[in-house]
């Protein structure tokens, strides 16, 4: 089956033995006694969260006496008739999926839904291996729980598959269920986006910070996983790599546990840069989609846009980290693939083609939340604050950081203020007065841009840093 780690003969036995060894090693590190399951819980039923949990189920689900993978998603989300019809086509195009559903006595309900005689629900189809935001890519069957307390109360590892816009609310509720816990769980966040707070001082709040604040789980137990992750491609065994970022205590053992033959996971200590880049890339992906649509997929225009937007991203990270991780490896690959393909780039294309409008909102059927929209607002508001002023390299005067980010400014005026049309993004990258993006990068490295207060850290004398 595509997406399964099952293999025949000796190779299958070898793969299973390696997986069991990694599972046993993590169980020992987490202090699990014999007979006490390692409970892995995915929170959120979006495409990447569901696919990630399905990867773990494929890898470790066979060891039922040692590990359990389950997913929480909200109940009550109905599958519309058009999606049900398409899902039926997908099922019948895949013999392995068709046989599995017949064997599980689950096929008939999809026939009835196609005919309009039955309503399917998102949690119901996820149990059968279908994510509502990714029905073209069948997953393995998953254990799905719709009661949040039941799902998370005894979790050892929690996978945050929620959008950043929902993370605070859901983990605030989870925090109430964990008040009596003696040992905090380990949390791996897949969320890509940030919140901005202006009062009392400008600062960003990343998903890992939201989770820690909401639950009381120490930051050393909360990690971020990012990389070039197109969910359907990774589940279908397209080769990919990723980084798990956070404190020393957990990132190395988790990198080893998560690594699969086609999904290579490295570890990195720079949590902030990776989380911030995870939010920034969604912003610039919307613009990339617009450029692609408006230029008839011009490779030259897209490459010009890529060079300009990555220089803005590098500049912004120097405000948030004293020595930010270089835009290379999985960090660069994540940016590239998101600008090339993904829901945010898709959204930008549809806006530029007139097939979607801003009035339709940023939650799109079959795609989920377009996180780049809220990220545009957050970063623009944050970087507009005069208290963060930097020296303009040409006029030698203090300006708000956003004044050195013309693409971010343009996207804000298109998406949030709605003052400009989508073709304004082309004017932003074709401005004759624009300087070489290399100059922005050199300026960020030359000037002391780091503002620890943006992370809620005490102010330091950066001239002596």
Curated annotation (Swiss-Prot):
GO BP term, pick one: glycerol-3-phosphate metabolic process
Compartments, record wording: Cytoplasm, Cytosol
Catalysed reaction equations from the record: sn-glycerol 3-phosphate + NAD(+) = dihydroxyacetone phosphate + NADH + H(+)
Binding site for substrate: 192, 343-344
Record carries keyword Oxidoreductase: yes
Swiss-Prot/TrEMBL keywords: Cytoplasm, NAD, Oxidoreductase
Residues noted as binding NAD(+) in the record, renumbered to the chain: 44-49, 192, 231, 343, 371
GO molecular function, one term: glycerol-3-phosphate dehydrogenase (NAD+) activity
EC number: 1.1.1.8
One GO location term (cellular component): cytosol
Active site per database record: 281 (proton acceptor)
EC primary class: oxidoreductase
Family: Belongs to the NAD-dependent glycerol-3-phosphate dehydrogenase family.
PANTHER family reported in the protein's UniProt record: GLYCEROL-3-PHOSPHATE DEHYDROGENASE, GLYCEROL-3-PHOSPHATE DEHYDROGENASE [NAD(+)] 3, CYTOSOLIC-RELATED
Function as written in the Swiss-Prot or TrEMBL entry: May be involved in cell redox homeostasis.
Protein's UniProt name: Probable glycerol-3-phosphate dehydrogenase [NAD(+)] 3, cytosolic
Organism field: Oryza sativa subsp. japonica
Upper classification of the organism: Eukaryota, Viridiplantae, Streptophyta, Embryophyta, Tracheophyta
């Amino acid at each position: 089956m595509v997406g399964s780690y099952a293999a025949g003969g000796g190779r299958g036995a070898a793969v299973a033995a390696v997986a069991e060894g990694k599972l046993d090693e993590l169980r020992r590190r987490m202090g699990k006694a014999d007979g006490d399951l390692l409970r892995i819980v995915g929170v959120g039923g979006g495409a990447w969260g569901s696919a990630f949990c399905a990867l773990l189920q494929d890898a470790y689900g066979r060891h039922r006496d040692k590990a359990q993978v389950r997913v929480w998603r909200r109940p009550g989300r109905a599958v519309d008739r058009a999606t049900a019809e398409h899902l039926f086509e997908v099922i019948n195009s895949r013999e392995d999926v068709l046989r599995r559903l017949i064997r599980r006595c689950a096929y008939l309900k999809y026939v009835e839904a196609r005919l309009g005689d039955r309503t399917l629900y998102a949690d119901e189809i996820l149990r059968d291996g279908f994510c509502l935001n990714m029905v073209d890519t069948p997953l393995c069957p998953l254990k799905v729980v719709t009661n949040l307390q039941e799902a998370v109360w005894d979790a050892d590892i929690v996978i945050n598959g929620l959008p950043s816009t929902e993370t605070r609310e859901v983990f605030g509720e989870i925090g109430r269920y964990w008040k009596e816990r003696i040992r905090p769980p380990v949390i791996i966040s897949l969320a890509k986006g940030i919140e901005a707070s202006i009062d009392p001082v400008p600062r960003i709040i990343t998903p890992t910070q939201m989770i820690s604040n909401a639950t009381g789980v120490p930051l050393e137990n909360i990690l971020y996983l990012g990389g070039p992750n197109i969910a359907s491609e990774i589940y279908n065994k397209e080769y990919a790599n990723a980084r798990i970022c956070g404190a020393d205590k957990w990132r190395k053992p988790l990198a080893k546990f998560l690594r699969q033959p086609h999904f290579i996971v490295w570890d990195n200590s720079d949590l902030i840069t990776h989380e911030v880049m995870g939010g920034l890339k969604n912003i610039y992906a919307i613009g990339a989609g617009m450029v692609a649509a408006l230029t008839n997929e011009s490779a030259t225009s897209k490459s010009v846009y890529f060079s300009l937007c990555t220089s803005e991203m590098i500049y912004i990270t120097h405000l948030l980290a004293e020595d930010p991780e270089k835009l290379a490896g999985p960090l660069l690959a994540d940016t590239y693939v998101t600008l090339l393909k993904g829901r945010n780039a898709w959204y930008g294309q549809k806006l530029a083609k007139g097939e979607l409008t801003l009035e339709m909102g940023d939650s799109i059927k079959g795609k989920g939340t377009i996180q780049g929209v809220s990220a545009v607002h957050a970063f623009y508001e944050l970087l507009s604050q005069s208290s963060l002023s930097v020296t303009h390299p040409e006029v030698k005067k203090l300006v708000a950081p956003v004044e050195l980010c013309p693409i971010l400014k343009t996207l804000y005026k298109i998406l949030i203020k709605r003052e400009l049309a989508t073709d304004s993004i082309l004017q932003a990258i074709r401005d004759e007065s624009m300087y070489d993006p290399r100059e922005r990068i050199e300026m960020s490295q030359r000037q002391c841009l780091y503002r620890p207060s943006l992370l809620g850290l005490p102010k330091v004398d950066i001239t002596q840093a």
